[in-house]
Amino acid sequence: MIPLPIRPLSHSEFAPFGDVIEPDDAKSFPINAGKCIRYHDLARVETSGPEARTLVSLLKGEPYDIPLTLKMVERHPLGSQAFIPLTGNPFLVVVAPDEGGEPGEPIAFETGPGQGVNIAQNVWHGILTPLRSTSEFVVIDRGGSGCNLEEHFFEKPYQVEYA
C-alpha cells in the first residue's frame, strides 16, 4: 500500500478542491436586531445539468478507524457537495487533483472542531469518513436528472495514516 499521511485541514491547502466551512469574522455581520451574527457566503454551492436543484439532507455516519485503506474516490460532475458537521467530531476528507480524467495523488485532511467542507463540482474525493464517534452532518448537494457520480478504483490502494 502507498502511505497517505493525514494533515490538518486549512483554507489555503484545501482551496484548489473547494471551501472550508467555518465561522469567519471577516464575512460576518449582525442581523435580527443584533441578536444574531451571520457568517455569510462561506461556500460556493454549484448545481448544473438537467432539472438541477439544490438538496439539503441529513446523514448519520459510523466512525472509521485509522489507519484506513483507501481503494476508491468519486466525483460529482454536475454539482458540489458540502458536509457540515452537527457535532464537534472530526472527520477525514480525502481529495485528489484531476489528471486527464483520472485522480492524481490523493491528499488526506482531518477537520478541526466545527469545520465543514464544500467539495467543488467535479473534484475527486473520498467518501464521508467520520472519526472517533458516530457523527451527524447536514449535506448540501445536487438533485435532478443526469449522471452525477463517477467512481475510480486505484490499482494500488493507499493507507491513510497519522504522520
Swiss-Prot record:
Record has Methyltransferase as a keyword: no
Sequence intervals crossing the membrane: none
GO molecular function terms attached to this record: ureidoglycolate hydrolase activity; ureidoglycolate lyase activity
Claim: Lyase is one of the keywords in the record: yes
Pathway per the UniProt entry: Nitrogen metabolism; (S)-allantoin degradation
Sorted UniProt keywords: Lyase, Plasmid, Purine metabolism
Gene3D superfamilies reported for this sequence: Ureidoglycolate hydrolase (2.60.120.480)
Known function: Catalyzes the catabolism of the allantoin degradation intermediate (S)-ureidoglycolate, generating urea and glyoxylate. Involved in the utilization of allantoin as nitrogen source.
Self-association and partners: Homodimer.
Protein name (record): Ureidoglycolate lyase 2
Organism: Rhizobium meliloti (strain 1021) (Ensifer meliloti)
Name of the gene encoding the protein in the UniProt record: allA2
